[in-house]
A protein has these predicted regions:
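Non-cytosolic coordination micro-motifs
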Residues: 1-14, 49-150
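Mid-chain, structured segments of secreted extracytoplasmic proteins
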Residues: 21-64
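Short N-terminal edge-element motif at the start of the domain
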Residues: 1-33
Length: 150
């Protein structure tokens, strides 16, 4: 389905396939995780290009939070906290880099959930906005299979 929408496959390993392309007008990397038999998708992650600008991250996050709120109603949970003591980009991005920022919202939707968050990246003082979709039935199927393996 992603290839039909213009996404380009950039690789796969085990049950994870990666694609690049345009997601709602923004460049993004899409990770699709399938069940062990490869027949069902149980998680999809959308990773937007990293940014070293706090305002860019928050504006992107707020745009998608508004979109999902319009479609699914208010988030089931939302926590937006950056412990920086100064309102400067350097101070705010330093907190992202240290992993102390908690900036996310989640929606329980029919068949699964959606999580939206600002995450740190491997880059110096960079972060990215990430959206995760999980299919609860296929997640449970995978958990049951994994329980059999242990």
């Amino acid at each position: 389905k992603l290839k039909a929408k213009g996404f380009t496959s950039i690789g796969s390993e085990n049950n994870l396939a990666l694609f690049m392309g345009d997601f709602t007008g923004r460049n993004a990397t899409i990770g699709v995780t399938a069940t062990d038999d490869g027949k069902s998708v149980f998680a999809v992650a959308v990773l937007f290009d990293p940014s070293g600008e706090w305002n860019t991250l928050v504006n992107t996050y707020n745009y998608y939070k508004d979109l999902y709120t319009r479609k699914y109603g208010n988030p089931t949970i939302s926590k937006e906290k950056n412990p920086a003591h100064l309102d400067s980009n350097t101070a705010l991005m330093a907190e992202v880099h240290q992993g102390t920022v908690v900036w996310g919202s989640a929606w329980e939707v029919t068949g699964g959930n959606i999580e939206l968050s600002i995450e740190k990246t491997s880059g110096f003082y960079e972060g990215m906005v990430m959206i995760r979709y999980r299919d609860s039935q296929n997640v449970e199927t995978k958990i049951q299979k994994d329980l059999e393996d242990i």
